[in-house]
């Protein structure tokens, strides 16, 4: 658990500057870009104390017209920006969070707004920020604050439930001239709770050099174009393989970090760098030519798994018993075959396929690929055929594709029980 919490995280940030920002900078886009690069450099500096690096991987400037309605109603603007990000921006450029920078003044004292504990979510990993000051640092700290909300942090307050050790830290409810670049004990706890509870996956991946769109800064711990390594400032760098002042490898070094970098040299070819997680995963080994561990690979579909009783599909070993356990708890088991005869009826929730409003019953050979039936605990004389159904998601409670339905056979995505060799 502690290792998971201590792992370095990378927020790959997309920033959108709206039309009002272009007007504010008199149409000088180069000047506007520089202003934003400075903001991101400060945000990265602020977050390094939490072992988070923030990299600008995309910058979009709406120089002709706004692509959403940016208004003084912060709540509405945030909602439409989140919606636009999910339906438009994400399809064009991969990133973890998107923030809008605007010169429109929000109602009341609001200078920014963001969804809380939403990092990595499609329509809510967003924030909006008002470019409210001539001082770059104050705008950067506003965006750092809103990004903090995305990462699960609430405001620093002192009340009966919460005693925060700082009144002027990044997550202070209001911005002041005394504002600091530090995070309070409350923010650190909130962030750790967010990691534990939500397990956001997207921020575990390091951006590649070519993903970062801001000019390289030696000493910011991000590996950028033109750098061989970046271990932070000369004062804080503790990596003997990297010259902190130049961001070049020290003499005789082949690498400075990576799963296949051992004491500044590439690990020997064949050295395991990522163990197989389970039957459907493959262990990866170093090539001897690179500091990076090869891409995580999976066993081929149809590879036997689960004591040779099941078959792999997309890196998972779908086992019917486990599907019952996930719905009904540890005492659940797959129901007897007789329960699956309900799927032959093709009525109510019992079928193999449903297209629009039409229900297709299962053929006899496919009955174990339709609705899943389970029993709870030991069975007596009477068996109740337990099943699960959801109005919102018709796939919930159905046997998962890839599940074994007979010897040498699996359910395909059409819910037919087919030979494992033809399924894949």
UniProtKB/Swiss-Prot annotation:
Glycans are attached at residues 69, 185. GO terms for molecular function: metal ion binding; metalloendopeptidase activity; toxin activity. It is found in: Secreted. Disulfide bonds join 120-202, 164-186, 166-169, 218-247, 229-242, 231-237, 241-264, 255-261, 260-286, 273-293, 280-312, 305-317, 324-374, 339-385, 352-362, 369-411, 405-417. Optimum pH is 9.5. Residues 9-207 form the Peptidase M12B domain. Non-hemorrhagic metalloproteinase that degrades fibrinogen. The alpha chain (FGA) is rapidly degraded, the beta chain (FGB) is degraded very slowly, while the gamma chain is left intact. Shows a prefential cleavage at X-Leu bonds. Cleaves insulin B chain at '29-His-|-Leu-30', '33-Ser-|-His-34', '38-Ala-|-Leu-39' and '40-Tyr-|-Leu-41' bonds. This is Zinc metalloproteinase-disintegrin-like brevilysin H2b.
